[in-house]
């Protein structure tokens, strides 16, 4: 019986793909070597220890229907579209070795006619007339008895959109967490016009088989056809949840300030696990009672635009004469935290 396993995802859902990765990683025999090939539709994928409000333009992502997905490995934020080919290599220890998986990807690129080199800890680069360009980035995760190496190959990604979603708004966030490093990148189709996702997957799979000296049939998976993965429904529910993707962010503070016709307002939030743990308000409004009540009401709320907007709107019952002010506050706060 082969110790290799090759899975290819037919789904573009990042939460599905990351849940499959997590489930297989947890339940695979320690003697198995797995290659999982996949790609995501428009998604920003952040590292396990990152703050999405700090790393991403969350407002633009919401407007453009770009998903956020937190992965279980470390590293920085990346934008995925269907021009990215994603790979995951998994193995038990002591077999797990990210040098082996890196060399498999390099061999795959070489077989396609692309000469690439490993650079630094995580990147694969190609030499161009303009200097080195990154075509692949990776991240890693290890437990006591197994490890995985996953990464992306920039095939034909819309590089103009990288800056749209990975340059965060200039929000006043005093945030902890790992900050992403931006690199100069290139698409493989600039070197090999017409190169397809299927060709890249085939090349990586062949290099995988060649390294281990055996072959297996690919298992094609999708939400309609998943392998037998224990607790997959629970893993998918977590991976797709706001609590994991946003709420898992390191603690941070957010300062909002705005001047309205009726006065200036400063709101200070401390946020932990996606919930507001402390709120302070400062205002020169002639009637500060609504703002003070709002600060009290927002404490304990989820740091989500719609939740904070509901809290603001609920105060209009208590302060009917300040309804217009509260409407303006509600719209401002909701816009600021998106």
From Swiss-Prot:
Main location: cytoplasm
Binding-site list for (R)-lipoate: 134
Pathway(s) this gene product operates in, as recorded in its UniProt entry: Protein modification; protein lipoylation via exogenous pathway; protein N(6)-(lipoyl)lysine from lipoate: step 1/2; Protein modification; protein lipoylation via exogenous pathway; protein N(6)-(lipoyl)lysine from lipoate: step 2/2
Record's catalysed reaction(s): L-lysyl-[lipoyl-carrier protein] + (R)-lipoate + ATP = N(6)-[(R)-lipoyl]-L-lysyl-[lipoyl-carrier protein] + AMP + diphosphate + H(+)
Molecular functions per Gene Ontology: ATP binding; lipoate-protein ligase activity; lipoyltransferase activity
Gene3D superfamilies: Bira Bifunctional Protein, Domain 2, CO dehydrogenase flavoprotein, C-terminal domain
GO biological process: protein modification process
Keywords: ATP-binding, Cytoplasm, Ligase, Nucleotide-binding
Gene Ontology CC entries for this record: cytosol
Record-linked Pfam families: Lip_prot_lig_C, LplA-B_cat
Every BPL/LPL catalytic domain range: 29-216
Highest taxon, organism lineage: Bacteria
InterPro entries attached to this UniProt entry: aa-tRNA-synth_II/BPL/LPL, BPL_LPL_catalytic, Lipoate_ligase_A, Lipoate_protein_ligase_C, LipoylTrfase_LipoateP_Ligase
EC numbers: 6.3.1.20
Subcellular location field: Cytoplasm
Binding, ATP: 71, 76-79, 134
Reported function: Catalyzes both the ATP-dependent activation of exogenously supplied lipoate to lipoyl-AMP and the transfer of the activated lipoyl onto the lipoyl domains of lipoate-dependent enzymes.
Subunit organization: Monomer.
Family to which this protein belongs: Belongs to the LplA family.
Note: In the transfer reaction, the free carboxyl group of lipoic acid is attached via an amide linkage to the epsilon-amino group of a specific lysine residue of lipoyl domains of lipoate-dependent enzymes.
Protein name: Lipoate-protein ligase A
Lineage: Bacteria, Pseudomonadati, Pseudomonadota, Gammaproteobacteria, Enterobacterales
